Amino acid sequence: MLCAIYKSKKKDGMYLYIEKRDDFSVLPDSLREAFGIPVFVMLFNLVGKKTLINTDNREVMEQIKQNGFYLQMPKKDDWLFTIEKSCDL
C-alpha cells in the first residue's frame, strides 16, 4: 500500500499520511484547519522493506483503512526540550 506523506506548516513534527496524493476529502474540517496547508514530503510503500522512523507501518495502514488518514503528532520529548531551552534564557 502506497501512501502520501505531508508535513504541517503550522506545527513542527506533525505529519499526515493519506492513501491518495492530494486527496484531502477524507479529513475532517477541524483537522484541515489545525494542520494548515499540507506540504508534500514523499510517497511511501507501507508494505515494503523500509520502516517509518517515528511510527509503525502496520499502525499507519490500519488507521488509513479505518479513518482514511493517519496523523502523526510531534514527540512529547521535543515539546519538553523546547520548554527547557526557553527557561535557560
Curated annotation (Swiss-Prot):
- Organism, per UniProt? Actinobacillus succinogenes (strain ATCC 55618 / DSM 22257 / CCUG 43843 / 130Z)
Which protein, by its recorded name, is this? YcgL domain-containing protein Asuc_1390
In terms of Gene3D superfamilies, this protein maps to: YcgL domain
The record's section on PANTHER family has: PROTEIN YCGL
Outline the extent of the YcgL domain. 1-85
Record-linked InterPro entries = YcgL-like_sf, YcgL_dom
Pfam families registered for this protein in UniProt: YcgL
